[in-house]
Curated annotation (Swiss-Prot):
Keyword Cytoplasm in annotation: no
Superkingdom of origin organism: Eukaryota
Protein's UniProt keywords contain Plastid: no
Alphabetical keyword list: Cytoplasmic vesicle, Endoplasmic reticulum, Membrane, Transmembrane, Transmembrane helix
Family label: Belongs to the VMA21 family.
Topological domain ranges for the Lumenal compartment: 34-38
Protein's name in the database: Vacuolar ATPase assembly integral membrane protein VMA21
Record GO biological process: vacuolar proton-transporting V-type ATPase complex assembly
InterPro entries, A to Z: Vma21
Originating species: Candida glabrata (strain ATCC 2001 / BCRC 20586 / JCM 3761 / NBRC 0622 / NRRL Y-65 / CBS 138) (Yeast)
Major localization class: endoplasmic reticulum
A Gene Ontology term for the protein's cellular component: endoplasmic reticulum membrane
Amino acid sequence: MAVDVPKSVIKKLVFFTVAMVVLPLLTFFTLQHLTSNTIISGGLAALMANVVLVGYIIAAFTEDTTEYAPEGKESKKE
């Protein structure tokens, strides 16, 4: 019983997954290079992870779901 997942959903998920890994690490090591304070580097890396998470939540809520409606159910916009 396979489910057809739209490519835009997969692309969005892959983008935010990569961003969740890369941005905090990039932030941590960049700030670690600029300053020797590990607390600041770690704190801002955690902040970047939260920024990515909030961005994903906003993108998920603003996604247009009418085009993904099952064939048997019509949207109420008619």
